[in-house]
């Protein structure tokens, strides 16, 4: 009887161990898949190969888009023999229907997309020959949806900037129309904004994004629908901040609210991947073409 009891105990122990191991198999399998995924990321080649390319220390901001063609899907080109010239320090607004190629042009300026044919010249140099890592140090982007971190206002404004002086920070706060807002907070610049800036309004978040761009003192500004989701009061405050940001800097703007681009030096109307009209706001309104009709529909 004792031997039988002993064997039963051994058997139960072995069965329990085997059962536990079987239950662990799915977890081990998922763990191995995760390890493989992490390994693929760590071992992957860089998306951009900047080795041997020209490092740039200064940028004037003159752009030439020469016979530019690009397609995400070979069956439908997004940019179709686009030709544009943007002078250094000039503000150009890109307008048109969704899918016209506006955001693709911005991605070309940043260097995220490479042309299938044609060239993008920066200060007369083909961007394919430029070290994009050094080039992007001269760019600031203000997107439609502000990207804030859960730290303080100070942290969000100065993020990525190595040398910070209180004088420069105060100048940026004034230029971004943040002074009255920050002075009204008990903790001022050290106020915690919450996850994704959840404790702030849309206009406040956007002005902090503009201040962050100003801190970088960029040569090239990219504004992607920076005022599209704001009320009229917030839009006015942000428009003033944007005017300070874009002064004497080459600026690319994508806008659907055409009233916000009256001050642009040039407006490019895009359709089917190429520029159909090009000129100042007053010139295009006098032309009474596509831009005129688009503006009339928004009145």
Located regions from the model:
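Cytosolic ends of transmembrane helices, especially the final helix of ABC transmembrane type-1 domains
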Residues: 13-41
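Conserved E/DxxT/N motif and adjacent residues on the DHp alpha2 helix
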Residues: 40, 47, 158
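An intracellular "coupling" helix at the cytosolic face of ABC transporter transmembrane type-1 domains
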Residues: 27-30, 47, 69-74
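Short, hydrophobic secondary-structure boundary micro-motifs
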Residues: 22, 49-51, 193, 293-294
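Conserved catalytic core of two-component sensor histidine kinases
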Residues: 8, 15, 136
